[in-house]
Regions:
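Intrinsic-disorder/low-complexity, polar/charged segments enriched in Ser/Thr/Lys/Arg/Asp/Glu/Gln
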Residues: 348-350, 361-363, 394, 404-406, ...
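Bacterial N-terminal signal peptides
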Residues: 3-15
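Glycan-processing catalytic domains of CAZymes
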Residues: 19-373, 380-411
Length: 565
């Protein structure tokens, strides 16, 4: 929050508490700073908050304990939760020897109320206050673990004097290690009056996500809804952009600065927040109502997801990472897109795709890795699941300016398993995609088993394939027979083996045999029983070189069967 607004901008929080269990949100936390003033502490005012799809009520200053109780009663009646602002949670309380007793009396007043969500402690502290904040926050967690102790941090554009540290990263590190908060909340207002955006907006998202993941702490973002100081009045697209970029970065709670418009602000800044000074819906109210509604719907899924990576395409913002070629979804390199990847507890994979441009809609063609067999959108409007059309491993999506779409990925990959030991040589490749344990490919690529044939593509000068895990008795076979078709290459093949006595392939354990690289099927017999290092040996692995010295790159060798006799 801005320092000039702090005196009146009392905060809020989000999530739902489990009685005397560590705080965990039951619903995606959506809240605001600066709620109805004391004289508007009415059921009608809180109904307007509820109708805007907020889940947690923020508060404005000047509430007495009785006012807070009245507010909580209204919230409970409407199915809302509320943050408590009370001087007994102030960071200065840590200076008193009896601060634990202060908190005890606070919890006695509010802790058992069904609408209590948490307790506001401080906004935008300097690092020198972290030790005191740690005492207050941890005492609240000890005495009332089911409710959230809330502290909000500065943005990246704060000065070292404001931060109390030379860098923002150290500020986060000290806060998380000393205070041990339940959430990592911050504000960053990127929309400037000159029409530009702060260049460090995404870097701030990166740092918050990174440190939140390091410490296992959920992150919250505070978004701009009030034109003030050097910040412009957001458009609907810019409001959407703030929401979906935050969601893609794994934010587990969103708040708006502000909900209420004070008369002095309206006069000084010439605009309104979400409601006007009389508590009546202003221009942004229906916009926020829709975005909050979408967040509530998507939040049912997002709360259970873990952010695994966030990447960009187009011109990559400062401090961010370009999407790499190994990602499951590939983006057009020239479009300003953002993609966040997630997994749930079962390993199911999700992605949030966002248009980083809040001025223009975009259409994008996504290229999927071969093992991604389906994309299903979780619709923000109603939570319904909508399969997306795929064609040749690609999907086309349209995105509103600043908009995002949440996708669930369906994947199917046949992971190779350790071959089972074999006591016989009889390979016929009759099961599609089953290599029957053959591997160790060298200078051979693209193995395909189809229609009773193993097909391989030449890609180098020393092609061979290996079948290990054999348990052949001594002298079990006297010859190896192979039926194959060779398009090109030298007219000579080789057959190697290993034994229990000599477990490595070597030039003293192989036989050459003549080949016909004419593109026709031929059967070949390799008289292994005549070799002294085959005779009487327990064979453990075999290797087939379908030609020596390689073949024309891209040409094929097809193998019908390999068997021992």
């Amino acid at each position: 929050m801005q320092a000039t607004l702090l005196a009146v901008a009392l905060p809020l929080l989000c999530g739902a508490a489990l009685a005397q269990a560590p705080w965990q949100p039951e619903e995606y936390p959506i809240s605001y700073w600066v709620g109805p003033p004391r004289e508007f502490n009415t059921l009608a005012a809180w109904q307007t908050v509820k109708d805007c799809n907020f889940t947690v009520c923020g508060q404005y200053g000047g509430y007495s304990r009785a006012d807070n109780r009245t507010r909580l009663d209204f919230c409970a009646q409407l199915g809302l939760k509320a943050m408590i602002v009370d001087g007994r949670t102030s960071w200065e309380a840590a200076a008193y020897e009896g601060h634990a007793e202060l908190i005890k009396s606070l919890v006695a007043d509010y802790g058992s109320h069904p609408a209590t969500y948490g307790y506001f402690i401080l906004d935008e502290p300097s690092a020198d206050r972290f030790p005191a904040l740690a005492k207050v926050s941890q005492e609240l967690q000890r005495q009332d673990p089911g409710h959230l102790p809330y502290i909000n941090l500065l943005p990246t554009y704060a000065s070292p004097t404001q931060l109390g540290t030379p860098t923002y990263a150290e500020h986060l590190e000290r806060f998380l290690s000393q205070v041990k908060p339940a959430v990592l909340s911050y504000d960053h207002y990127a929309l400037l009056k000159d029409g530009s955006d702060r260049v460090d907006y995404f870097e701030n998202l990166e740092l918050i996500r990174d440190y939140g993941r390091r410490y296992g702490v959920p992150t919250w973002n505070i978004l701009l809804s009030l034109p003030h100081l050097n910040y412009r009045e957001p458009s609907a697209d810019e409001m959407r952009w703030q929401v979906y970029t935050s969601l893609a970065y794994g934010s587990k709670g969103l708040m708006w600065f502000t909900y209420w418009t004070l008369p002095a602000w309206e006069k000084e800044f010439g605009g309104c927040a979400i409601v006007n000074p009389k508590g009546e819906p202003a221009r942004l109210y229906p916009i926020v109502k829709q975005l909050n509604g979408e967040t509530r719907v998507l939040g049912k899924t997002l709360l259970g997801l873990t952010s695994t990576g966030v990447y960009h395409s187009g011109q990559v913002p400062l401090g961010c990472t370009r999407l790499g070629v190994d990602a499951l979804i590939q983006l057009p390199g020239d479009l300003p897109l953002l993609i966040g990847f997630f997994t749930d507890a079962s390993g199911q994979q999700y992605a949030m795709l966002v248009n980083r441009d809040h001025a223009q809609p975009v259409e994008a063609t996504l290229a999927l890795k071969p093992h991604v067999t389906g994309l299903t959108e979780i619709r923000a409007a109603d939570g319904a699941e909508q399969p997306l059309a795929l064609a040749a491993g690609k999907a086309k999506l349209s995105l509103e300016a600043g908009g995002g779409r949440l996708l669930r990925l369906t994947t199917a990959f046949a992971y190779a398993e350790l071959p089972q030991p074999l006591t016989a040589l009889d390979f016929h490749f009759n099961t599609a995609a089953d290599l029957e344990g053959w591997g160790g490919l060298n200078s051979l690529t693209q193995p395909v088993v189809k229609d009773g044939t193993l097909t391989l593509t030449f890609a180098g000068a020393d092609p061979f394939l290996v079948r290990s895990f054999l348990r052949l008795r001594p002298d079990q076979y006297s010859k190896i027979r192979v039926r194959l078709r060779l398009e090109s290459g030298n007219p000579e093949g080789q057959f190697f083996w290993t034994s229990s006595e000599e477990p490595g392939f070597a030039d003293n354990k192989y036989l050459s045999f003549p080949l016909q690289p004419d593109g026709q099927w031929h059967e070949y017999t390799i008289p292994v029983g005549e070799h002294p290092l085959w005779q009487g040996k327990a064979i453990r692995a075999i290797r087939l070189d379908p030609t020596t010295g390689g073949a024309t790159p891209g040409s094929k060798v097809e193998i019908d069967w390999i068997k021992g006799e």
